[in-house]
Amino acid sequence: MQNAPMTALLPDALVMAAIVVAWLIDTFVGPNSRRTTYFIALLSTVVAGIWFAIDALTPGAGPQYFFSRMYVVDPFASVMKAVVSLGYAVSIVYSRKYLEDRGLYEGNFFLLGMFSLLGQLVMISGNNFLTLYLGLELMSLSLYAAIALRRENAPSTEAAMKYYVLGALASGFLLYGISMLYGATGSLELNEVLKAVASGRINDVVLLFGVIFIVAGVAFKMGAVPFHMWVPDVYQGAPTAMTLIVGGGPKVAAFAWGLRFLVMGLLPLAVDWQEMLVILAALSLIVGNITGIVQRNVKRMLAYSAISNMGFVLLGLLAGVVDGKTGAAASAYGSAMFYSIVYLITTLGSFGVVMLLARREFEAETLDDFKGLNQRSPVFAFVMMVMMFSLAGIPPAVGFYAKLAVLEATMNAGLTWLAVLAVITSLFGAFYYLRIVKLMYFDDPVDTTPIVGDACKRTLLALNGVAVLVLGIVPGPLMSICLNAISHTLPL
């Protein structure tokens, strides 16, 4: 459909309008606008997220194209946009007290976060290599600035510089790859590139080099090995509120962005990029799970956890095509989509507890800070235990089903050795997740002060934990949504 009704873009426009309104209020009202800016960001993203969710659940919705087919609204985009929008809303609720204690409760944080969210929306709905790239840069530039908000804090500025320099390098790779694909196919639109590549009348060498550079760019944004160097330093160096913004929605958007690039644009070259993803996935699983064992800083440990989890997402991406056939593609890509959503939900809960333990002039970042948490707050200790079980893949947490679905897709693709590697490395990873559980329940607390968070945050954290358990017991509805979105969107 070429001339789709513009009403399909209203939730995206709502986020843009909220940015403009919040920016004007923050500029002309000043410090007194902090509370207003927070509520504008929260309300707009919750409404947009619910709107996206309603669109995603509307039966019979097909792709709708806008702006000369550069932007697409389809079931896949609606689901992922709902996830990142609601994920951002939860992030700022968890971050509020943390920001107030550190003098960061200001419009800049919320504005940069919303600009990052807008970039994620563009990444998810991009139907053109240029649109996908612009969405990526809008997201990335906002995150660089957000990480460096504490200019007087050396670790924060160092983390921002590392992220910026390596991000610029990855953007260069990506642009070079896109330019080679454009030179070979004569188009930047995903559908046209797909047709041109499928025709087989294009220089294979140019295509292969283009794919290599694009895969490198995708791997960097997902934090996959060997393009992971920025992840541990950024997670540890940035204030925890910024770490959650970086490690939450952008990971989901990066997966959606990679799916658009590789599947919607370069599916005929699946044999080529699959081989590269196999290497990236294997390295990510090994490095993420084994290196995480020796970490004493919880944020750095969760960074290596993110790397290993992106390895699982890559498993789902590479398992979609078997011997050039796409019969099992919907199941594989649906499992990867399900995994990325589950990872976001679990990450929100994990960092929510980390920020809950932090207080003015104190960061709860070491393993010792979790000792005896059950004695200080049984509810929050239970929530953290559920999150660790999910990350480790222990039932009944939803992480178990997510890992099982990806492993099944990998086995069906004939990559048994890779599935076995994933299981073995996950056993290593389970050690550092269960170590936190042991510290919370079997060690004496260093600080016996009871933990009391605000009512909103307590309620949201409890719901976060319940969601992980309920989805683990009844994963079918969410998996069905993912499979439906994939089957009605991708060229399978």
Swiss-Prot record:
It is a multi-pass membrane protein. It catalyses: a quinone + NADH + 5 H(+)(in) = a quinol + NAD(+) + 4 H(+)(out). InterPro entries: NADH-Q_OxRdtase_suN/2, ND/Mrp_TM. The chain crosses the membrane at residues 5-25, 37-57, 72-92, 104-124, 129-149, 164-184, 205-225, 239-259, 276-295, 302-322, 337-357, 380-400, 414-434, 466-486. One of its GO terms (cellular component) is plasma membrane. GO terms for biological process: ATP synthesis coupled electron transport. It comes from the Bacteria. GO terms for molecular function: NADH dehydrogenase (ubiquinone) activity; NADH:ubiquinone reductase (non-electrogenic) activity; quinone binding. NCBIfam families: NDH_I_N, PRK05777.1-5. NDH-1 shuttles electrons from NADH, via FMN and iron-sulfur (Fe-S) centers, to quinones in the respiratory chain. The immediate electron acceptor for the enzyme in this species is believed to be ubiquinone. Couples the redox reaction to proton translocation (for every two electrons transferred, four hydrogen ions are translocated across the cytoplasmic membrane), and thus conserves the redox energy in a proton gradient. NDH-1 is composed of 14 different subunits. Subunits NuoA, H, J, K, L, M, N constitute the membrane sector of the complex. This is NADH-quinone oxidoreductase subunit N.
